Amino acid sequence: MKSLILAEKPSVGRDIANALNLQQKSNGYIEGKQYIVTWALGHLVTNATPEQYNPSYKEWNLEDLPIIPKKMKTVVISKTNRQFKIVKSLILDKNVKEIIIATDAGREGELVARLILDKVGNKKPIKRLWISSVTKKAIQEGFKQLKNGNAYQNLYEAALARSEADWIVGINATRALTTKYDAQLSLGRVQTPTIQIVKSRQDEINYFKPEKYYTLSINVDGYDLNLKQQKRYKDKKELELIEHKIKHQEGKILEVKGKNKKSYAQPLFNLTDLQQEAYKHYKMGPKETLNTLQHLYERHKLVTYPRTDSNYLTDDMVDTIQERLRAILATDYKSHVRDLISESFSSKMHIFNNQKVSDHHAIIPTEVRPSIEQLSQREFKIYMLIAERFLENLMNPYLYEVLTIHAQLKDYNFVLKEIIPKQLGYKALKDQTSSHTLTHSFKEGQLFKVHRIEIHEHETKAPEYFNEGSLLKAMENPQNHIDLNDKKYAKTLKHSGGIGTVATRADIIEKLFNMNALESRDGKIKVTSKGKQILELSPSELTSPILTAQWEEKLMLIEKGKYNSQKFIQEMKNFTFKVVNKIKSSEQKYKHDNLTTTECPTCGKFMIKVKTKNGQMLVCQDPKCKTKKNIQRKTNARCPYCKKKMTLFGKGKEAVYRCVCGHTETQSQMDKRMRDKTNGKVSRKEMKKYINKKEEIDNNPFKDALKNLKL
């Protein structure tokens, strides 16, 4: 009898097989004497679509809503049906005595495995592998500490409740809004509040009026002492009056006080912090950073589990620090690493905190030594960010003295603050500057003459627009960006980690760009006209993060076995009735700001111009029609002169390729150039790839709503 191991994806399945020395490879699984390892391909099973409950739901009709199934159904995803059949046959195999769930250790990973087991009708005992990295050592250690599957039943119930609630609310809200206003509109408990967060910041900036204010400083022996102000001076004349009073007067040093302080490095990375840092340094988008991290985690085995919300490590990891350091010897920081290897580390260090680690600890390097030449440029950059932060947190704190000098001139007090480094500590990793000392030694009671008096003009600044990095942080802390009437929800949002999860926020932002609710220009994220209308047309409950706070509060209770998941689902059904009825009874109108005078060749209605990832296309304004045609799109065809990608206008024989440098080619000229380049041997596949024929309506909510809507 053997144990069947169910991994989340093939790469992890292969890692487990390698760690357990399973060598007999078959189609969809790998076998050994004691174990068989198989895998999902992400989700193999998902929630059924509305039309799978009732074929009449294929047509979107307002009167059919809300669609509330008595019992939620699941279906096998058609494109992964072949792998599902393999997994099913292995689960039901008489020679398999138990199932070991080895999907990602978290709410969503639990859902991936349990939906498969439930669909198959598994009755065999379940065990759970719970690990944070997929190195050989971590896997082998994990198999020595397998947990009983029952210990994770509440986690599964919370995951299932979240999935079903998102389906019920998301499908109905999206269909209600779309059919009510005859427009492709999408709602969700995470995406709609995210639009609101951006809108609130945009309004703040638009309504901001800069104000001038003034400060005064005196110069004593080359050092500027600032006037201690009880208020902000908006009238320059007030400071000019003070200047007149203190001019040519003698001052006195009242106090010279030094205070020793220390600061630690910024915390170890969780996913959101790392995505922010990658955007700040390299302008890498959140999705790009996550994909790069996945490669470092799965393919190269260089970092621990990426989808974590923790900045800390558990106490039992203290013994793994040395071998992780030895791996980093392959980087340019080897001299610092050698110094650290000779030290001993304690679980009392600030980076260790069991209470602040739930599913996964912070992202840190594994014990695998990197082959730098095998990493892509992006992989190298992200790995180095993680390695640097890890090293900084193991190094000594930065020690410095804050020297404060208080002085008096007439009836006015002045202050000078100087930071004097004592020990660079972790700052030495990137900063080799020497300690700074004051060249003038101020003493208490010392009298001085003022060398210069200056009045400085300042202006208040508007807050900055969100970029992809800062928006992630705002989603993590929405209570800081939206006015919440009830302060208790601010606490809940802070405790639950905001709206969305570390794993889904990047997808949410990308989806909002694709559906044209948000746009980014020069790194500044703004709400489009469509986004503003979505907020105006949506029930207020869906524009506030309070709904997510309430959900998350209850989902966490379900995880702990303190709340009934079925009660939660019933509450979501009641909420959905309320939302749909509000939309149905609304008298507001939706205005297409991108309506053209081009008639739809299918139904005759005017078409809408929409932006896609690769260009622009025309889409029929009637969601039921679905007619679309390309206006222009970026291709992979390179200009023969400046080598930039060319844009395709039109189609067929009338198609024209244009470059920003002014070069133009017809379709026949492009075809000839392609043939000449490859001596006439151009496969259909290569041609397709070259001009990127894929046509897609990027802001279409239908496919998301009907397939695997993630709100």
Swiss-Prot record:
Pfam assignment, any one: Toprim
Sequence ranges assigned to domain Toprim in this UniProt record: 2-135
Native species: Staphylococcus epidermidis (strain ATCC 35984 / DSM 28319 / BCRC 17069 / CCUG 31568 / BM 3577 / RP62A)
Annotated ranges, domain Topo IA-type catalytic: 152-580
Task performed by this protein: Releases the supercoiling and torsional tension of DNA, which is introduced during the DNA replication and transcription, by transiently cleaving and rejoining one strand of the DNA duplex. Introduces a single-strand break via transesterification at a target site in duplex DNA. The scissile phosphodiester is attacked by the catalytic tyrosine of the enzyme, resulting in the formation of a DNA-(5'-phosphotyrosyl)-enzyme intermediate and the expulsion of a 3'-OH DNA strand. The free DNA strand then undergoes passage around the unbroken strand, thus removing DNA supercoils.
Keywords per UniProt: DNA-binding, Isomerase, Magnesium, Metal-binding, Topoisomerase
HAMAP family: Topoisom_3_prok (MF_00953)
Interaction with DNA: annotated span: 186-191
UniProt record similarity statement: Belongs to the type IA topoisomerase family.
GO molecular function: DNA binding; DNA topoisomerase type I (single strand cut, ATP-independent) activity; magnesium ion binding
PROSITE patterns: TOPO_IA_1, TOPO_IA_2, TOPRIM
Annotated site (Interaction with DNA): 60, 167, 175, 307
Protein name: DNA topoisomerase 3
GO BP annotations, alphabetical order: DNA recombination; DNA repair; DNA topological change
Active site: 305
Top-rank taxon, per record: Bacteria
UniProt xrefs under CDD domains: TOP1Ac, TOPRIM_TopoIA_TopoIII
GO cellular component, one term: cytoplasmic replication fork
Cofactor requirement: Mg(2+)
Entry keyword ATP-binding: no
Keyword DNA-binding recorded: yes
